[in-house]
Swiss-Prot record:
Lacks alpha-helical transmembrane segments, suggesting that it resides in the membrane via beta-sheet conformations similar to those predicted for other outer membrane proteins and porin. This is Mitochondrial distribution and morphology protein 10. InterPro entries: Mdm10. Component of the ERMES/MDM complex, which serves as a molecular tether to connect the endoplasmic reticulum and mitochondria. Components of this complex are involved in the control of mitochondrial shape and protein biogenesis and may function in phospholipid exchange. MDM10 is involved in the late assembly steps of the general translocase of the mitochondrial outer membrane (TOM complex). Functions in the TOM40-specific route of the assembly of outer membrane beta-barrel proteins, including the association of TOM40 with the receptor TOM22 and small TOM proteins. Its main location: mitochondrion. The gene is MDM10. HAMAP family: Mdm10 (MF_03102). It is a multi-pass membrane protein. The keyword Cell membrane does not apply. GO terms for cellular component: ERMES complex; SAM complex.
Amino acid sequence: MLGFLDYIQLAFSDASKWNRDNSYSQLTTTANALLDFSTPERLKVNLSSLSTPHFATTYTLGTVGLIDGSISYLFTTVPLRDTPSRSTLIPLRKLVPGYRQISAPSLPPELPTVDGRDGDLAIGETQGILKKKPTLLHATLHLPPPTTLTGLFLRRLSPTTQLSLAFCSSRASTPKSAPQAALVTQILHDTGKYSSEFLFSTDNALFGFKGLWNFGPDPRKQNQQGDLARDSRRSLLSLLSAGAEAYYSPVSSVVGLSTGLRFTTLPAATESPHFTFPYTLTLTLTPLTGSMSTTYSLLASPNVSFSSRFGFNVYSWESEMVAGCELWRRSSNNRLHDDKSQRDSALFGVDDLTWARRKMGLPDTAPSRNRECDDLPPPRYDNYYHQRSPHASDSVIKVRVDQSWNIRALWEGRVKELLVSAGVALGPTPRSSLSYASSSAVGGVGAAGGLSSYGWKSVGVSVLYSS
């Protein structure tokens, strides 16, 4: 589950009209959310608040084995008035990353005004308001010692360019040693057709570059053709993207290189019926280390997703296989509250099987139960699906397993006014030399079961309350 300030930061990206999907860093976002999720390892409590549309705070306390905490503050120049901040109102799908349905490439819109409205709507406003650049400031102080301070500065320089400054400073472990600090500077450029990212880190003077290219129509040229642009986006059913990244450090002589491909369906970008389930395929290569990884993610239904990954190294002949899934569920109480909306949907011929009819090529609507409503226009399927599903889920279950039988299970949901995340990790654990020697003396190596045993690795619970 995302932290509260991470959720606010995503809301800032949406309010400032920045497309975070059009980046090489987000190439495998869906597979990572379904396969590489983390589980809590101890008890953790988070208290957060969006006190004003511009200011948010978070206080964190962790216990069981090690007591630590953090204090975080966030400020943004873009008002987040329409962003739910209470833990009872935040859509759970906004906090739990899952199958990421990206949108078709488009030209970045104008910057929002100081009151949060789109720039193209404020025609009669002054130029000073139109040129207001969205800015975000975020700082976190981690306690107890060694104290660490982290910060983030985001600023939109133009509709297509964003500047990011991130720093980390740790207190020295000994009085005579110098404190450790690092600054990472990123300049991101997004035109819709392609995106680029330039990076510099003061840690070993690391330079980096990332780029992503989308095959297909160019949104910059289509934007000048009016209706032709909308017709082209409506007919775009899938998207193929290719990208690469490179790093170099003259201080430590470190070189890094990787490249990747992504193919994904775009059901949200078209009004034409789809005859396949939404899915995403990725292929990433790291030539210097000889690593190759492929992922396949599938949205089997609005509430069920599957993902798998296969990795292989041509130098060591080592392989990796991981599979995972997520299942969204609803409580019986919310089903009773939604009876009225379901009856209204039935009058229009829209029910929970609409998505399945589209896959089979059948009409989107079921037979109407009220002939008086036959002449009314049915609601659009995409609006019905996207507006209903984010608020209709109360909990989610995630499970992943690899070839070594390392299993992670995670449950995240809403309990009263709290957002709770509970997880467990199982897998082979190394035996101590003493227990292995005693087992070998009694029954030999076979009786001991080898150098490892299967058992619990971690169990934890995280609780979030926000206002």
